[in-house]
A protein has these predicted regions:
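Glycine-rich NAD(P)-binding loop of Rossmann-like domains
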Residues: 1-16
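Conserved S-adenosyl-L-methionine
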Residues: 23-26
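Conserved beta-strand positions in the Rossmann-like core of class I SAM-dependent methyltransferases
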Residues: 29
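Conserved acidic E/D residue at the C-terminus of a beta-strand in Rossmann-like folds
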Residues: 32
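Rossmann-like adenosine-cofactor binding region
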Residues: 35-129
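Adenosine-phosphate binding glycine-rich loop
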Residues: 119-169
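Conserved small/polar residues in nucleotide/adenosyl-binding loops
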Residues: 172-179
Length: 183
């Protein structure tokens, strides 16, 4: 296939996207500040040193970053503009990580760029009207709406309640890691 896929955040979802993309012959690159490069390399992934390098290298970038104070609006004009000609940005993370004003301006400046997201952005009408055939969104967030995800969320909640009642322990889940807080 010859296409290069960039995984922006190599957590559980990013790993599964990489696994599927490898199965169709894509070259996989990843950037994640929390995941050791050795983990990515063991999975046959090519780690890169920065988000800028990831976007400059890959034809397709798949976003999996959480919406935090440091990541909100971090996917901006300068970063996405590094993508090669005919780049495709796929956002299955959160809409808050996208600087929509920047992305609108960039898509106007770069008629080769495409954007796909699983949650309708605030500026959906502008994207749809100005960029037909280059933009697609679902009407609501779809990422966690599977039977398996809902079952796993229920099990995790039950374990946290039992842990709190039994041992006065609270757990916070961040990405693929778990942090314990003794109360």
């Amino acid at each position: 296939m010859g296409k290069k896929l960039g995984i922006h955040a190599y957590g559980n979802v990013g790993r599964n996207v990489a696994r599927i993309a490898k199965g169709i012959g894509m070259d996989i690159y990843a950037y994640d500040t929390y995941c050791p490069k050795e983990v990515m390399e063991a999975d046959g992934i090519k780690p890169v040193d920065s988000a800028e390098e990831l976007y400059a290298t890959c034809n397709v970038v798949s976003l999996h970053i959480p919406a935090t104070a440091e990541t909100k609006n971090s996917i901006n004009y300068d970063l996405v503009n590094r993508m090669p000609k005919n780049g495709l940005l796929v956002n299955t993370a959160r809409k808050e990580v996208i600087n929509e004003a920047d992305l609108l301006r960039l898509m106007n400046d770069r008629p080769d760029l495409k954007y796909v997201t699983d949650i309708m952005p605030a500026h959906h009408e502008e994207f749809a009207d100005h960029f037909p055939g280059r933009y697609f969104s679902t009407p609501k967030k779809m990422g966690a709406q599977t039977a398996e995800a809902n079952i796993n969320a229920g099990i995790a909640a039950a374990r946290q309640i039992v842990g709190f009642l039994k041992d006065a322990v609270s757990y916070t889940h961040l990405r693929a890691h778990e942090t314990r807080h003794d109360l």
